[in-house]
């Protein structure tokens, strides 16, 4: 598993060992959106760790916006790209192997990484140990109840776990966090939970109704239902629009930094 995620996963998923300028543009737009999601919880100078930092776009954007951000990324080539092409502190390694003193971070983010780990609770508990009391953890994962993807694509080959909102919140409580809010993306495909690191979280709550709801959602999401909805027909146009937007964002740029700086400038976020 470790060999796969340190050297093979990105090639399988993205088709290359380092991100293209177009992929950097997409990740950069995503990083700006993630900053907007984080902004209500941030204070100037916060120490932020992006666990599963990919090519370092989130770390770069946050540092440009005045935060003390760093990252941890298991893929050797992507972590090296972040350090060399973007000049940001992204260490190569797995959360389960890394060590930081208690209270090292005010904020930890984990975007589409928790579903890839063998023991999600152990990972969140480890992150909690590195965080300041009342620090903020933001986790984004695919939504197992999503109806916007084809039934045959619900369970990704590289995902160890799948999450509903209730399960994600219970997992956070078990690891030493108290849920602040959980939201679903507009298309229903992703869940985002914001947690606060606390000394004594409420005990996890397990509701049989959650099992029944998730089970019904998975069983009920048939090919007939999916192809009778708008998702399979609007999806290709959405992907084409995203592709064109990414190409335009990267147009005229020669380096990853130029792509991200252009996006930050156009975002009109106050630096």
Where are these regions (language model features)?
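Conserved N-terminal segment of class I S-adenosyl-L-methionine
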Residues: 1-103, 107-111, 121, 204-271
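Catalytic cores of nucleotide-enabled group-transfer and carboxylate-activating enzymes in metabolic
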Residues: 74, 141-143, 163, 180-182, ...
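A short His-aromatic
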Residues: 112-116
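Short N-terminal helix/helix-N-cap motif within the alpha/beta-hydrolase-1
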Residues: 118-122, 149
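A short glycine-rich, Lys/Arg-flanked "PGG" loop and its adjoining helix->strand segment in the class I
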Residues: 121-136
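Short, glycine-/aromatic-enriched active-site segment of Class I SAM-dependent methyltransferases
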Residues: 139-173
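Core SAM-dependent methyltransferase catalytic element
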Residues: 175, 184-219
